[in-house]
Amino acid sequence: MDENEYLFKNQAGKKYKTIYADPPWITERGGGKIKRGADKHYPLMKTEDIVNLPIDEIADVNCHLYLWVTNKSLPLGLEVMKAWGFEYITAITWVKDRIGLGQYYRGMTEHCLFGRKGMLPYKLIDGKRAQGKTVIIEPKSEHSRKPKAMREMIEKVSYAPRIELFARERFDGWDCWGNEV
């Protein structure tokens, strides 16, 4: 049994209406042998390995997916989303306060792709449809930590039960899977 099968086994039989994932993408880049990006902080995964995660075992037939991508990994994210059985709906862009890595352009944004599988009715708050925004402006903190506003928006717009894949810490009301929790 490989590591992914083992970790997902802990969720056996549980189906989630919301999946939030920040995969450790391997993307080709130029430069030397110095580790400067994600590979300095944690092991990376090939797109094929991300695609092959048994998401269908944990995704409800009606499910929302939030999938983080960098500018470089955007096409890979769309490929993964489709392979996991989700229809792309929109992207939520995080505008950071500091410049990051890049070759031609140095990034100050990341994107969280939003997709759905099946049909979930809109959540209502006081009789009105719960909606989020497609832009988050929040300062960058430590490497790979995502904005707090994203989780708050997910809780507002999408249904429980929820799971975070490749999680760094635990949050009330969420199941977590990852090598940092």
Where are each of the predicted segments found?
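Class I S-adenosyl-L-methionine-dependent methyltransferase catalytic core
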Residues: 1-181
